[in-house]
């Protein structure tokens, strides 16, 4: 990507993915490009990561967004949020033409360095289409291997369970098929059925004196309002 790009390179990633920031910084240095962290979350996460020693770079390699926009376009990389097509992110605003600091133009190369999270396909591909309509070349996982999963493999999950030896396990953040497989892995490494709580969102889990019990499920989720009593919309 860096070899082929003739103009600006805009890399969209998660603001919390420090390892990807490091990769971009190192690659940009090899290609004699300066890097700018765009947006508050990206800037703050990079600052904190550097202070804690998780992100390593020379101060001279990083420039402000204002400096980057005034430099030759083949000498800069802009790190932005919005790899999941979020409409209020920097990349989302670039796609919609609503970003007030700079826009997308012919010659820009935009890299979406993460695969769409299940359920996010529509906003991601909508953003890609709109960026291309504005003249950018968009690189994403379907056409080039720019994505590496940030999720642990099954063997890594087993290793973590061996190291931590948790008293209880509550698989979260995934579809039921994923949570159930997580439970199977825990059983394989020696955990007991009663140590694992496989629950749906809204289920109360209580811990009293170190013991886990399951309570009732609180109704939740989306609430749709039809607006019938709100009045006409002009």
Where in the sequence are the language-model features?
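Acidic/His-rich, metal-assisted hydrolase cores and their charged scaffolds
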Residues: 1-234
């Amino acid at each position: 990507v860096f070899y082929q790009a003739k103009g600006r390179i805009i890399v969209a990633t998660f603001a919390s993915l420090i390892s990807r920031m490091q990769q971009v910084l190192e690659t940009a240095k090899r290609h004699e490009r300066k890097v700018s962290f765009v947006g508050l979350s990206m800037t703050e996460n990079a600052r904190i990561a550097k202070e804690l020693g998780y992100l390593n770079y020379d101060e001279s390699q990083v420039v402000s967004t204002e400096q980057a926009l005034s430099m030759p376009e083949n000498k800069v990389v802009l790190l932005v949020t919005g790899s999941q097509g979020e409409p209020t992110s920097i990349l989302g605003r670039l796609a919609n033409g609503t970003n007030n600091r700079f826009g997308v133009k012919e010659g820009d190369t935009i890299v979406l360095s993460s695969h769409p999270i299940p359920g996010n396909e529509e906003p991601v591909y909508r953003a890609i289409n709109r960026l291309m309509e504005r003249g950018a070349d968009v690189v994403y996982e379907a056409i080039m291997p720019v994505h590496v999963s940030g999720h642990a493999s099954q063997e890594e999950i087993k290793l973590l369970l061996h190291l931590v030896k948790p008293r209880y396990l509550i698989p979260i953040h995934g579809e039921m098929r994923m949570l159930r497989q997580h439970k199977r892995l825990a059983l394989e490494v020696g955990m007991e059925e009663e140590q694992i709580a496989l629950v749906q969102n809204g289920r109360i889990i209580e811990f009293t004196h170190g013991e886990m019990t399951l309570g009732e499920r609180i109704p939740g989720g989306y609430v749709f309002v039809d607006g019938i009593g709100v009045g006409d919309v002009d």
